[in-house]
Amino acid sequence: MNPPNIDYVFWPASVRRYSFREHVEAAAAGGFTSLAVAPETYRRAISSGSSVAELRTIADDNGVKLRHLDSLTDWAPIRVPSEVNPELRERFDISADECFAICEALGLETILAVAGYDKGVISSDVLIDGFGRLCDRAAQSGLWVDLEFMPFWGLPDLAAAWAIVDGAQRENCGIMVDTWHFSKGTPDFELLRSLPGHRLVSVQVADAMKHQRGSTLFEDTVRFRKFPGEGQLPVVEILKILHEKGHLRHIGSEVFADEADELSPAAAGKRSAESLGRVLEAAGIPRSEPELRSKAGGFSERRPA
């Protein structure tokens, strides 16, 4: 059995062109229970004149918990890949100190650790040590750390991520399974089934066509993802495996796509929720309360006292 209260996470890829306020609006429109916040989103909000109190009030007023940091690369000696677009450079080239300060300011509960280095440039011993140190620091603040693999950079697949998590042997960490990265890289279903469930508590859900549409895998992932259930990837099968392990706590939609960029925040949030709901139902994952839903009523905003 999975935990009774699943956290439905809005990873704001589908509203990447918008500000923090619109990210909250999208999450609320879809009835998501929490929001992931990128360091650069926080930076921009603060530099535009918003206070931390105002950001937290906006989220609270709309029933959206600020819970996840997306993302941190400063656990490894290299935090930015050699070839990356300006948007991701802005996200990745941020110190661990700043990331932890953001977590403290917003009251976040989890950190998404990403490999911002190229394949084969850092030894496994260095990576295991660096990840372990990150987990130790996170544990001091009661934070959970998920390690995400991506097929086009230095941590390409589930096996590589498991080698680090298993090698680090920390209690407050696991692996983020992104259905796109898993399917487009080395989709090892046997390994996925064999891993301990307590290390697989989080999943990001996105779909795609089986064939590569972009000139590179990276272009494919940032331009041509599809909403869950609208493509050809084995999304439901992945979700079934994770659900059967009984430890899923965080389930979220993450759709980077040119198509999604054309949607309003509210429309993106609702479509994310509706499409995610359909694949969860197909995977036999029961809805928990508060139920993922399209929210009635408009976006709420007020200034803190």
What are these regions (language model features)?
Residues 1-9, 14-31, 107, 158-177, ...:
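Histidine-acidic metal/acid-base catalytic patches
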Residues 41, 83-89, 225-229:
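The substrate-binding groove and active-site-proximal loops of carbohydrate-active enzymes
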